[in-house]
Amino acid sequence: MAYPNDVRNVWDVYNVFRDVPNREHLIRDIRNGLVTVRNLTNMLTNMERDDQLIIAQLSNMMKSLSIGVEKAQNELSKLKTTDADRAAVLAAYQTSVLNIERNTMLLTGYFKQLVLDLTGYVGASVYPILPFMITGDQSMMVDSVKVNMKNVFDDKHEQEIVLPIHPACFVSTITEDTSSVVYADGDELYSVHVRHATMTMYVNVLGETVETRQLSMIGESIVPDDFAPSLLILRFSQDSVGEVFYLSHGNMKKFLGYSLEYTDKCSIFDVARRVSTTRNTIPNGFCSVDGVPYLDGRFIYQPSGVSADSNICAIYNSYVLDTLRYITECEVDTLRSVYDQTSSTSFSKTDVLTSSLLTMQSNISALSAATPQLANDVITFDSTDLLSLGTVLTVSNEFTADDTILSTSLAGHCQVDYSEGSPQDKSMSISVSCDSSQLVSSTVHSYSADILGHGLKGDRTMNLMINVPGLMNPQKVTVDYVYSDGYKLNFASVVAPGAPFWINATLQLSVSPSAHNMLSKLTPLDNDACPGLKAQANTPILVSMTINLDDATPALGGEVIQNCVFKIHHGDDVYSFVTDFDVVSYTSTSGTNCLKLISSVDITSQLPSDMVIYVMNGSPDAAFTSGDSVNMSSVDWHQSTSQTVGNYVYTTMKAYWNVTSYDVEARPYTTYVPGKVNFTAVEHADVFVDDYNTGVNSYVIVNSRIYYKGTPLYIEVPSGSFIKVSYFTSPLKNPTVDTYNAEISRNSAYLIKANASLDSVATMLNNISNRIDAMERLMEPTRAQQIAGVVSSIGGVISLGMPLLGAIVVTIGTIISIADPDKQGIDYHSVANAFMSWCQYAAVCRYEYGLLKRGDEKLDVLSFMPKRVVSDFKNKPDVISLPELGESVLRGSSTDYLDTGINIIYNDMQLLGQGKLSGWLNKTVSKVENNAANFFERNLVKSLANKEVLPMHARVEITQTEKIGDVYRTTILYTGINEGSYLGGDVFASRLGDKNILRMNGFESGPGRFKAIVESTTEVGNFRVVDWTVSGMSRYEIYAAAGEIYPSKDPSHADVQLLYESIVRDLTTRDGSFVLKHHDVLLLPGQLDAFEELIIRNASNYQYAFIGSNCQNYAHDVVDILTKFKRPQRWIKDDDFKLYIQSIYDAL
């Protein structure tokens, strides 16, 4: 449409265009002085063009959904900006779409944070504690700059401070160029600059531009990653040295050479925000905030007591549900709001549902983008030439400056020559030492080859390498020598003392048993010997292959379906080997967590090894050094023989050549000094190619060759060879750091097997038309008000507006449950039944109450409890009389507390000290309990509670009310770690309620219980504590629960009653306690007694651990036992659990 140019002022324009689309935005700009008459025409023209683009986008989005709502498409295509009514609806849709997109970005950001959680961060939400806008909320800042930043759990872990950078903060409120700068110790730590004209954001960390993002919401497509939060992490170790990490959607950077002092654990941040303008309508502003953010619930931990993968599954599952619960609640409100706005108009219900369809598509797209998907890849390798093994050899030099001496023993003999007579020989061995000090800096093989392969996900490169472990380990090698044929080394010559000069001894070295026979002379040294390092017998020769899976999710792993074959050529002989690929999660040198395939095959399985010689190259300064190396002992050369004849003695001198024995010895301090060695450039290597031979199974490494029994070896990966692998893709490709390696191989097999269920759900719920019909029925005025109640009854997980999303979420939870059956205590048959029930419920809301149908009529009552039954139950113990104490106690102050079912109660145990952080946590938990918390507070507390790492003590309160004649009896069973009487072995002395626990038998921890029973004959809530004997607890147990030492003489009945009532008083006074989880359950007859007997029998099996098996994990197990009949396999015996079930059946 055309816009007039003859208006007198901006206010005339306002009056003319007050009904145009986006009028609120236009009015705001006029009032702020951002619109002038001169540029108004251009602005409105651009606005109309943008509106038309939005209309086209909405139409395309609906077409891409493949839904059968032709009427909606036709009506939408008729919408024009000149139609005020239609334009208003379009504007509402447009606003809804933008809100949904923002929610989707938020969801994507949370999934990114999940990846951090999966790798060792116990994470709550990441929210903008440091607001970027000048008018931002500063309520989340700590007031004082001197704040104790102790780790919540203990002081043994590294300290993390996380600063989020949220691009979404700049999208709708920034109308000028803006900069935000964060300082550490007076230096600029990072800065964020937004250019309004191009809506581009630049992030600089320590002076380096780390990323650039486009923040425009208008265009053909929106890139979710541009709106995902980035994290700046400062990690302080125990030595107070800080490291700086920057995590974005695409990469992670670790800044080296930069450190921060953090010795006093106080604030190091000064945050300044500067706003500069391009016009003079907004004055320059400056805002400074001093302080530090809250720790945001993020701590490094190492799980104990259970496997790491168990924690991964729990964190992933609970966080997905929490996040989607928030998204679902927002969308239900939007859906109802749109319906209310248009119910009186002529628009069809299909028109009304348009925004819901967009919501569904947006969230499905976000979930698909953030949820790991199963990928089945076949990697096929191209043809390769034969590679000499020496060209892909990598040797690790393990010599140090201290490893200077290597010793060996060479065989030799001594030959004594005479001018007359026969020569005499004496065999001996000569000890030779090698001064290896120069080997530390020697040049060794460091080669590999990349072989190109092609897969369904693109090109893959396989790195091929030969490894010989310990080849340069001074503890595993000796020095040996290679000799030329017929070689003899004249080591030294000596003459016996007093002997004629023609009698002498020559010491010679002969070929040692382990030496190699060279057919051609090899002369790198003057003494004709070529030294080498000889590895031990049976040293493996490993062919290592590595393939990186860059698009995989490291925490979920993968599974190799089929390996391939490679060949080793030895002359005319060819040996075939099968690869042994395994899936490994590792952290790269850049700190990125990755997944790769690794195969390692030992070729000595078919080519056995007696020795491996790594030949050195002789250097000019290499030489043998020795002192007086040979010594011949003195001989009495004037020895004579005598003969007596009669009275005469005849003497005859002995000839020199008749001396038959000489003592010749070798000195042990002969040393070889090789100098600095280049193992990759041995001289005269050609003799190994043609003339080398040996009779033993020997490997000799010379330059680019590895000889086996005198013949070089070659490797081949045949053309067309392929491997099959299944893994889970990581669309967001989020990097992580400081990960722990879960047992991914076991998880992966279960996950891959469960993928068929995910596909079947998508197929079952793909008919969007049926979903629309169901939604239209729900949108009838008589039932519209039930939407919030229906969603609430499902727990906020599945929205009827997006059933496919709900089904996928449930599938994720099911897959993760299957991935760790030991932790979940389930069998696959029950999982399948539960999974199908959830999917059916996601498609059509069939029941007003409850979720699951187990197909067991006796136990079905535990699947649901109608709200009206709870509401109609008036006889609750509001006031409890304690006759022995002469007191009455009023039940807790929580308005939504119900004396039916199961409560998980949390108490502050001062784990955070007594400072502001502890006070903030108690205040926040109280707000969550009373439904007064904001989203971020609620998400923080519930995320930690769902992960069972909330820094509080948890116990379970199980309440059952029965009417016996005219008497109402309420039984309250309290159970928890170190609560009441310890149920195995020694007894704990512990105080219940809001008191501190006092341990009396060391630091061992285990389950305990206390049973409180009250009765009433009225319906006004006045109850009276029964006699302690009715509870079935012994005197000893009651004294233990009261924290008292049992007296040497049995106490009186009245004394025990006094203690019993005091415990009931402490337990029923709920000051300082918080009920964060309530379960509406009607326990079956006999179930409470059967449960008590079950935990008494198995309490000693519970192995307490601070993470993974703590008081909150125990509380979760108790709820599962009572409500889901799920056996915690790590501490409940199967026979005892079957007895528990049978006892309930017998009572029924």
UniProtKB/Swiss-Prot annotation:
Disulfide linkage: none
Its source organism is Rice dwarf virus (isolate O)
* Residue ranges annotated for the PPPDE domain, each copy included: 929-1148
Q: What is this protein called?
A: Minor outer capsid protein P2
Q: Which residues form a coiled coil?
A: none
- Which keywords annotate this record? Capsid protein, Host cytoplasm, Host-virus interaction, Outer capsid protein, Virion
Q: Which InterPro entries match?
A: PPPDE_dom (IPR008580)
* UniProt subcellular location: Virion; Host cytoplasm
- Provide the active-site residues from the annotation: H953, C1111
